Each structure stands twice: as C-alpha cells, then as structure tokens.
C-alpha cells in the first residue's frame, strides 16, 4: 500500500477523487454514444425501471462512485488496483480507476466464481461483461484509455457487478431471504460478496449491505497489501492476485450480526458453532442477540395463553411452544403439558371467568398459577400487566391482567408452570404455591371490607369460592397488587400467618381496598377459615413468595386517592361597602330604599362638576387632597366608623381647611357609585371625619367666601357645623355610626333631599332646592363626596344662581338658583341646621361642643373663604371620608327620617348652610350639639 501510494497514487488519486468535470465530459460523450451506435445494452431487457441497462448501469455506477469518493477514500486504492490489474497489463494507471470500478471488478470475479456469471474481462480489451445485462466492453476500452488521461470515466461505464437487476436471470419472481434484513421476499438485487452471491429484497437493504461490503473490501485490501509488502512481493505482481486475496480477506471482516455495522477498530466476538457462526462487534450486541433468542424461545415454549401477554415475539411461540421447554421459571419444575392443559382453557375462557371455572377443578393449581404469575409474572408480564395495573391496580387491574395472559402464570410466569412458583429464591414447588395460596386466603378476611370490589378483582376467580381467595391473594401478589399491598399486605401476611392477619390485614384492606377490594370479598368467606392452617403452613413458603411480589413490581403503581383541592373563588368585595354596612346595619336597608327613591338625585352630582369646582378655588384645591385622603381612609375604615380627627383643637382651624378642601369628606355613600348614582344607599353610620392639620381656611378662601356674599356666610356656618362634627367625631364618636337620630331633621333636610352635586352650581342649587323643594325629598340622605365638597361650595358662591338652577335641574334638583342670596342663605342655613341636626344625631357622641366651638371659630374663616371652601369644610365636619372623590354631593333620598339623618352627616348640612349667614352659625351649632347629645 505504501509503495503504491508513493509511486503514483497521490496525483492519480486526486484525479479519481475529483473527476467532476472530466466525468461530466465523459458522461456527455457516453451519453452521445447511443446516437452514433446502439447502446451496449440496447438489445437487452430494460433495467430496473424499464430504462436501458446501459443508462441504468451508468447512473448506478455514478452514484456508487460518489459514495466511494465521499464515504470511503481508501476503498478507492484497493478498488482501483483491482480494476486496473484486470483492465491494464501494467498496474501503473490502475489507481485511476474509481471505487465503483474496483468494487465492480472484485464483484465480477466473485460472480464468475460463485454465480457463474460471465467472467469480467481482466484485460482492458475484455470481452463484454454482462453486469445488470449491460455490456461494458466498448465502454471499458475507451474508458481505460481515458483513464490514462487521468479521467476515471470508466466508473459510470462499468455497471456495478454487484447489482443484478430484477429483470435479469435472477430477477424472476424468486422468493429469497434477504441477506440484510433476513426477511423473505422477492429477489430484487444481488451482490457477490466473496464466494457467495447475496440477494436482497429491496434497494435499501442492498445499499446497506454494499456499504458494509465496501468497508470490508477496503479493510481486507489493506491487510493483504500490508502482508504482501512485508513478504516483499511487488505490488504489480500482486495486483492480479489482489482481487481474490481481497475477497478472502473480506470474508474475515464481518458485519456485526446484531447491529449490522462494520467496526474496524473492534475485534468481533464469535458466537455459535458449526456452519453458522455469528460475529458481534461488541459484548453488548452479543448480549442483545442472546436476549432476543431467549425471548423468542420462551415465547415459543409458552402455551398460547401464556405467550399472548409476553411480547411481539409471539410469532416464535408456536414454533417451540408445543413441546420445547426453555429455561424459564415454569420449565424448571413444571411440565409444559400441565401448564398448557391448564392454561389453554384459562387463557381464553378462564382469563375472565375461566380462572374460577378452569381452576375450580384444581384450585390449588390455580392459586399456584396465580401466585407464580404474580411473583414471576411481575418480571415477564410486568411490562403488560404493570401497564394496566397502574390504572386498575386500585380495584380490578391485578385480576384483569392475569386474565389477559390467561392465568396469573400466563401473565407473570410465561415460563413457569402452575406447580412451580417463581420467588426471589427461585421456582417454588406447587405445594409451596398451595401454602402461598393459603396465605392469600388468609388475606381475604382482612380484605373482606374491600370485598365488594372482589367480584371485579375476582374476574379470574369468579367461580371458585375457596380457590378464588388464592387468586385474590395472587392478584395482591401479582405486580399490580404488590406495589400497593406488597409493603403492607406482605408484611402483614406474615403476621397473618402468625395469627394477626385479621388485625394487620384490616388496616391494609382499608389502605389496599382501592386496589385489593375484589380479593377480600371472595376471600373473606373462605379466607378466614383457611387462614390459620395456611398461616402455619404458609409461613415458610409465603416468606419466599411474599418478597418476590415486592421485587417483581417493575413499575410504580399509582393509586388515585380523591383529595379535595380548594379552589379559591374570587368574590367581589368592597371594603367600603362592607364597612358601611356593618356600621349602618340599621340604616342600610333604609338606605336601599333611599337609593331607590333618590336614584334620580344621585345623578345630580356630577363628579366632573365637583372636580371643576375644586379646581376653581385654590384653597379648596389645597385642602381637597387632604380631604380626599381622609375620604379614602374613611372608605377603608368605613366599617370602623372612625372619625379621624388628628386634633380636636385643630378641628376648628383644620376643619375650616377641610371644609374647603375636604368638602367631600362627608361621604355618606359607601361607594362612589352610590354617590354618583344613588342617594346614600347605605346610611354611612360610620362617619370617618379626620380633621387634617391646616384645615383652617386660608385667608384667600375667606376672601372668596366674602366675595360670594351670603353664600360665604352660609358656608362659614356650615364649616362651623362641620368643625363641631369633626371634634365630636374625633373624640367619642370616632368609631360611632352616624345615623340620623331625628327623622324631623331628615325631614328638615328635604331641601337637602335633593342631591347636591359637588359642582358649585349644584350645591347652590341644592340650597335653593332645599328652599324650593323642601318637600320634594321627604326624608333625605345628603351625600357629600370627598374633596368635591369644596368646589361645590365655591360653585355655590361663585356660580350665579341661574347657573346653579340648570345644574340643579340636570341633577334633578328643583331649586330656584340663589337669586336671592340672603333668602338662599337662610334656606341653606335651615337646610344646614336640618342636616346638621341629622348629622348630629348620626354623630351624636362623635362630635363635642368643643368641636363645635372650633367649627365656629373656623366658620369665620370659612366665611372669609369661598363658599365652596365652606361647604367643603362643612363636609369635613359631617362628611364621612368614605367618598374619595372631591366635592360634596348631597343626594337627598326620600326615605325614613332616621335613615336620612344617618345618611346626612353634619358635613352635609354644612354645604347646605354654605349660604347661611354667619349669624346663623351659633344657633346651628347649638342645634347640632343638641342633636348629638340626644343621640348620645
């Protein structure tokens, strides 16, 4: 090899490896040949697909050569030498020949020797060779001459000698065993390998074998060359002999009989003796082959019923099943005839009902079969039974799997005979099996509670009363039961034998009931009696039997247990509403009525208006954030009904601020929706009034209030009232609900009953409405929304009564706009008083006289502030922080006076009294105090 490579191989090998362009040229020339002369195979039958053999061989050769170039570099050396030896007297240019040629030449020689096909010419002018029915004579000569030119064109011209088209002599519909896949089929391809001609059923098998053959040839050629070189024989002289040598050496290189691969780096392992010797590339392949053989033999030996569960190899079952005993647990100690005779009925009929019926004659045998199948079947039939068992294991699965296989022996002990039981120790005699069955019978009493399921589990034992218990025991021992019961039942089975079976087993039955219920039922009647004898006899035998079940379980058995899984269901919950409800339990139902009555008024307050009003007054804006915060807090704490007054002393000054910014603090509605849409649906008994520091109305607000005129005075009064409310709320009534104690006040608020929107126009309109429609809303709930109160107050002051009228009208507030500021103020004061009284009643203990004095002090400030600020202040005094939106919306809803009062906090009255002159404040405060005292 080395010499050959040194001589001329490198350059020529390159040519042979890269003949792309030259090959194309040659191909073109060759393809043109038919036009000039008839194709070599023109007269012969069409190849493969009806194409001329010449063209077919050309294509096949080309493909083969390509495979050689890219897949087998060194194959070209050997092939080229062989081909050139035959084609050329001198071996100089032989190396140019492509791998395909090389393969074809050795194949040709083999064909000559083995198939008797016409010998392929060894010389360049060889007689036409019939390969695939193609004559390569003409092509060989020109190709050889061209090869000297360095173009290995011959490859396409030489049809692969290995392939014989089905159309050829061999192609007749001859049934052959494929040399590759070992399947019987029509002969489609043949390949000469060494001294034998191999036939293939398909192109796929042929290609795989050819590849392996190439590898062998390459390896053999290398070996031969190395041997010859060592001997000192010149390569040229060897060249002619090389093909034969190569073939011989190829015979040494074998394809692994299991994986069908050629592994040059590994030494093959020989297996078998005589004519048929198998070679395997590794111990793994050898072991797999042995396992396959063993499996096939076992299946063949097993009776039909037993063989069914095992595996697809059942094809071979019939072959060796009848009289051949294989190395199986059953064959060790039990005659196959017995197994077959017993199992023959059981697999079919006894599988379901047969187990009881077929084994009824020999319950002990049936039990042994079951036990053996349970113990040994876990290994063999575990694949089949375990699969169903995981699902069925709780109840019927164990018994059903045995029916599937026929009897338990069939499932778990394909090889074992009924008398022989497979255990961790090994096959157990039938008597031991009987003992094991006895143990199983002992189990049934324990399993009796599960018994109801026994009919299911007893599908195998349905007919046999006492025998069934053994089978029931068998199911437990069977892989299906073993997973569940083996840990408990087997340990308990031993105690059972000792005399504790009932004690131990009952717990297990409970635990095992899902899986074993069927055995207990049948076994309970017969099981309890046999248990003591079985316990004594079976103790030793059971010990071996019990462990196997645990060992035999190949698959984990999943026992479905119903476990309640809590599914969280989100329930919409509004803390504000809930807070209002607990505090307003008495008033809530009324509030609902009020809501119904005042559903129209809620539309009065438009948050947009309230917001606009808030924006207008700077002081109100400054205070509104605080108030909004308070309102938000109030929402969260509505249930608590906490009036958040940081300082009762601050209540007056802060309250005036809040009155401005926190006008909406008086949120009697639990939610924004109630504010907007409904008059206070829920009497906000929980009025959380939080006096925020700095509530004292800024001078600017006071100035605004003064500018507004009478409204500013009323606002001041309202603020004073609110301050009182805040102080009271802060002290005793911080957490007290503020329902209207006096219906009269609520009725007094009827002008307020019309909801006052936060918008300035709305609030004045509310005041006016109070005047015009004191009776329009009988009991009224005044809802003051958070910070909105300030803007409404401003609107009261700033907005002309005419503007207020349309707003009031839109809000369903019938009120003459504050055309008469004085009159409107007075009416507003009245409304304030009413609302204050109502709120005072609501907040009775919540607001102290000190708070009222503080409110009075703040009232002057509030007056100086814009009337909007004042209402907001008032809202703070009486307002619940519950409503987050700024602006005080007083939505009077006709309803019971108590409810209305509860809904109307003093803060509400404050916005109403925003128009009340300052003079009115002291009396209003007094009234509020009185109401509060009454509530207390």
From Swiss-Prot:
Residues 349-382 have a biased composition (Low complexity). One of its GO terms (biological process) is animal organ development. GO terms for molecular function: zinc ion binding. Residues 108-144, 617-632, 708-717, 850-859 have a biased composition (Polar residues). InterPro entries: RAI2/SOBP. Residues 395-404 have a biased composition (Pro residues). The gene is sobpa. GO terms for cellular component: nucleus. Belongs to the SOBP family. Residues 1-14 have a biased composition (Basic and acidic residues). Implicated in development of the cochlea. Residues 1-46, 108-151, 311-330, 336-424, 486-511, 574-632, 697-727, 842-877 are annotated as: Disordered. Keywords: Metal-binding, Repeat, Zinc, Zinc-finger. This is Sine oculis-binding protein homolog A. A zinc finger (FCS-type) spans 169-207, 247-287.
């Amino acid at each position: 090899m080395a010499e050959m490579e040194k001589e001329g191989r490198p350059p020529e090998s390159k040519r042979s490896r890269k003949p792309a362009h030259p090959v194309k040229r040659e191909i073109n020339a060759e393809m043109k040949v038919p036009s000039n002369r008839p194709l070599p195979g023109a007269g012969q039958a069409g190849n493969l697909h009806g194409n001329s053999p010449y063209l077919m061989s050309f294509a096949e050769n080309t493909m083969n050569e390509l495979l050689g170039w890219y897949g087998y570099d060194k194959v070209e050396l050997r092939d080229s030498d062989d081909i050139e030896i035959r084609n050329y007297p001198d071996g100089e240019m032989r190396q140019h020949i492509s791998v395909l040629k090389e393969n074809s030449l050795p194949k040709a020689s083999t064909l000559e020797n083995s198939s008797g096909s016409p010998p392929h010419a060894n010389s360049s002018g060889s007689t036409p060779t019939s390969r695939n029915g193609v004559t390569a004579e003409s092509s060989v000569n020109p190709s050889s001459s061209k090869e000297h030119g360095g173009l290995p064109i011959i490859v396409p011209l030489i049809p692969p000698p290995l392939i014989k088209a089905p159309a050829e002599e061999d192609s007749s519909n001859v049934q052959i065993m494929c040399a590759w896949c070992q399947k019987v089929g029509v002969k489609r391809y043949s390949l000469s390998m060494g001294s034998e001609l191999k036939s293939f059923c398909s192109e796929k098998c042929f290609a795989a074998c050819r590849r392996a053959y190439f590898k062998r040839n390459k390896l053999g050629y290398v070996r031969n060359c190395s041997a010859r070189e060592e001997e000192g024989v010149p390569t040229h002289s060897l060249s002619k002999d090389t093909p034969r040598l190569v073939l011989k050496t190829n015979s040494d290189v074998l394809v692994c009989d299991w994986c069908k691969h050629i592994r040059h780096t590994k030494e093959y392992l020989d297996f078998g003796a005589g004519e048929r010797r198998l070679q395997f590339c590794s111990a793994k392949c050898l072991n797999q082959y042995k396992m396959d053989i063993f499996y096939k033999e076992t299946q063949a030996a097993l009776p039909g019923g037993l063989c069914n569960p095992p595996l697809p190899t059942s094809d071979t079952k019939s072959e060796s099943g009848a009289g051949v005993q294989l190395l199986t647990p059953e064959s060790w100690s039990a005659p196959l005839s017995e197994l077959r005779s017993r199992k023959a009925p059981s697999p079919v009929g006894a599988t379901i009902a047969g187990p009881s019926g077929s084994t009824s004659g020999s319950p002990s045998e049936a039990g042994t079969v079951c036990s053996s199948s349970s113990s040994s079947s876990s290994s063999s039939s575990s694949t089949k039974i375990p699969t169903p068992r995981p699902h069925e294991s709780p109840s019927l699965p164990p018994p059903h799997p045995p029916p599937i296989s026929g009897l338990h022996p069939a499932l778990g002990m394909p090889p074992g005979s009924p008398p022989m039981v497979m255990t961790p120790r090994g096959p157990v005699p039938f008597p031991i099996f009987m003992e094991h069955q006895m143990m199983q019978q002992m189990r049934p009493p324990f399993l009796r509670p599960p018994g109801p399921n026994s009919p299911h589990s007893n599908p195998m034992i349905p007919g046999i009363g006492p025998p069934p218990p053994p089978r029931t025991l068998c199911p437990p021992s069977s892989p299906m039961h073993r997973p569940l019961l083996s840990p408990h039942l087997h340990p308990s089975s031993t105690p059972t034998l000792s005399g504790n079976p009932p004690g131990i087993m009952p717990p297990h039955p409970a635990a095992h009931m899902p899986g074993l219920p069927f055995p207990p039922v049948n076994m309970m009647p017969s099981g309890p009696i046999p248990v003591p004898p079985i316990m004594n006899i079976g103790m030793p035998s059971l010990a071996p039997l019990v462990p196997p079940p645990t060992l035999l379980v190949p698959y984990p058995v999943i026992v479905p247990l119903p476990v309640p899984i809590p599914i969280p269901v989100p329930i919409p919950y509004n803390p504000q509403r809930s807070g209002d409800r607990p505090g307003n339990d008495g008033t809530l139902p009324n509030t609902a009525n009020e809501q119904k009555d005042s559903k129209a008024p809620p539309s009065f307050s438009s948050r947009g208006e309230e917001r606009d009003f808030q924006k207008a007054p700077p002081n109100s804006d400054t205070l509104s954030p605080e108030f909004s915060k308070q309102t938000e807090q109030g929402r969260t704490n509505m249930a608590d009904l906490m009036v958040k007054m940081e300082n009762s002393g601050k209540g007056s000054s802060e309250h005036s601020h809040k009155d401005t910014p926190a006008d909406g603090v008086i949120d009697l509605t639990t939610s924004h929706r109630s504010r907007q849409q409904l008059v206070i649906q829920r009497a906000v008994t929980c009025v959380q009034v939080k006096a925020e520091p700095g509530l004292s109305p800024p001078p600017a607000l006071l100035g605004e209030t003064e500018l507004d005129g009478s409204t500013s005075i009323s606002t001041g009064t309202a603020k004073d009232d609110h301050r009182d409310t805040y102080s009271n709320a802060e002290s005793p009534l911080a957490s007290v609900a503020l329902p209207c104690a006096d219906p009269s006040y609520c009725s007094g608020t009827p002008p307020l009953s019309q909801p006052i929107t936060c918008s300035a126009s709305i609030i004045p309109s509310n005041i006016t409405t109070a005047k015009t429609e004191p009776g329009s809303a009988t009991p009224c709930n005044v809802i003051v929304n958070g910070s909105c109160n300030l803007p409404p107050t401003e609107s009261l002051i700033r907005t002309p009564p005419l503007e207020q009228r349309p707003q009031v009208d839109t809000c369903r507030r019938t009120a003459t706009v504050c055309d008469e500021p004085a009159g409107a103020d007075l009416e507003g004061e009245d409304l304030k008083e009413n609302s204050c009284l109502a709120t005072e009643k609501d907040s009775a203990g919540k607001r102290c006289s000190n708070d009222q004095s503080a409110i009075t002090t703040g009232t002057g400030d509030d007056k100086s502030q814009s009337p909007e600020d004042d209402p907001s202040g008032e809202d703070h005094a009486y307002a619940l922080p519950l409503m987050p939106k700024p602006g005080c919306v007083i939505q009077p809803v006709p309803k019971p006076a108590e409810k209305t009062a509860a809904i109307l906090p003093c803060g509400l009255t404050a916005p109403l009294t925003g128009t009340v002159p300052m003079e009115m404040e002291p009396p209003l405060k007094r009234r509020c105090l009185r109401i509060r005292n009454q509530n207390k």
